[in-house]
């Protein structure tokens, strides 16, 4: 098996960091998904069985300030992956949503948005869609966007697989980021891991030629699985952190991650879609 890649993250002074159950850092979190276990698809096959999801259900209330920011900014900057009846959203017109045409990055499982915000600020010419299941994490990102005046981030609340399947066009993405998805360490739960062959194949289809899949995990077993699945996908080929890439792969190190650096190494895994 190829070398997985050691951590190449830059230090960040972004306040805070993801909670232990956020995907924005080594906190073991959702990879993005709706607050339900069912995929909610309209197709007959979807009604016959529930799709296994990669997130853990939980509820969290917003603070008064977060609620005010949510009500003010979410209608413009956010949307849902599914409607109240469970129907998937339509394909996104990203040019209309962002008000411009620019390279597009999808981050699945943005957590509290620490990495999302910092990387978007570093790349103002790239548009970023952050996908997260937890409303509180999205509200924290909205607050950061509001304070920093960032204009190149949009958000989707829901399942990252739904977003890939229904809302993103084939060949439209310059990059996909999956940072610290829930490793589901117990063997009987491995089927819940986000980066399965079917999901990686879907990501590869949505990437444009030369587009980048960037995954990071501090769970050794999950790193091995991600490496094997990515290397087995015929539309992807491994690239190095030092290569000339169309998007930045320098993610910020959150305060939580700095505390965790004495523990397991972080594996950074990158693939490029073949021409």
UniProtKB/Swiss-Prot annotation:
Pathway: tRNA modification; N(7)-methylguanine-tRNA biosynthesis. Catalyzes the formation of N(7)-methylguanine at position 46 (m7G46) in tRNA. S-adenosyl-L-methionine binds at residues 107, 132, 159, 182. It is an enzyme of class 2 (transferase). It comes from Mycobacterium sp. (strain KMS). Residues 1-73 are annotated as: Disordered. PANTHER family: 3-DEOXY-D-MANNO-OCTULOSONIC-ACID TRANSFERASE/TRNA GUANINE-N 7 - -METHYLTRANSFERASE, PENTACOTRIPEPTIDE-REPEAT REGION OF PRORP DOMAIN-CONTAINING PROTEIN. Coiled coil: none annotated. The gene is trmB. Keywords: Methyltransferase, S-adenosyl-L-methionine, Transferase, tRNA processing. Belongs to the class I-like SAM-binding methyltransferase superfamily. TrmB family. GO terms for cellular component: tRNA methyltransferase complex. This is tRNA (guanine-N(7)-)-methyltransferase. One of its GO terms (molecular function) is tRNA (guanine(46)-N7)-methyltransferase activity. CDD domains: AdoMet_MTases (cd02440). Its EC number is 2.1.1.33. The keyword Nucleotide-binding does not apply. The active site is at 182.
């Amino acid at each position: 098996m190829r070398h997985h890649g050691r951590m190449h993250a830059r230090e960040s002074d972004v306040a805070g960091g993801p909670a232990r159950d956020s995907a924005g850092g080594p906190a073991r979190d959702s990879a993005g998904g709706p607050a339900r276990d069912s995929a909610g698809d309209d197709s007959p096959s979807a009604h016959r069985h529930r799709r296994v999801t990669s997130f853990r259900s939980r509820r969290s209330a917003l603070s008064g300030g977060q609620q005010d920011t949510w009500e003010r900014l979410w209608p413009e900057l956010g949307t849902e992956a599914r409607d109240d009846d469970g129907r998937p959203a339509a394909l996104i017109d990203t040019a209309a949503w962002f008000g411009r045409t620019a390279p597009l990055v999808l981050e699945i499982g943005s957590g509290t948005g620490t990495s999302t915000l910092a990387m978007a600020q570093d790349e103002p010419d790239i548009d970023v869609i952050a996908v997260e299941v937890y409303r509180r994490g999205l509200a924290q990102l909205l607050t950061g966007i509001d304070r920093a005046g960032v204009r190149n981030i949009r958000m989707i609340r829901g399942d990252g697989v739904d977003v890939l399947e229904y809302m993103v066009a084939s060949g439209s993405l310059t990059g996909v980021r999956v940072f610290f998805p829930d490793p589901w360490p117990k063997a009987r739960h491995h089927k819940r891991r986000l980066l399965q062959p079917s999901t990686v194949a879907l990501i590869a289809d949505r990437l444009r030629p030369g587009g980048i899949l960037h995954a990071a995990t501090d769970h050794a077993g999950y790193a091995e699985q991600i490496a094997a699945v990515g290397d087995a996908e015929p539309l992807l080929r491994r690239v190095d952190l030092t290569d000339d890439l169309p998007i930045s792969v320098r993610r910020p190190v959150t305060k939580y991650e700095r505390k965790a650096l004495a523990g397991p190494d972080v594996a950074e895994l990158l693939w490029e879609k073949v021409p």
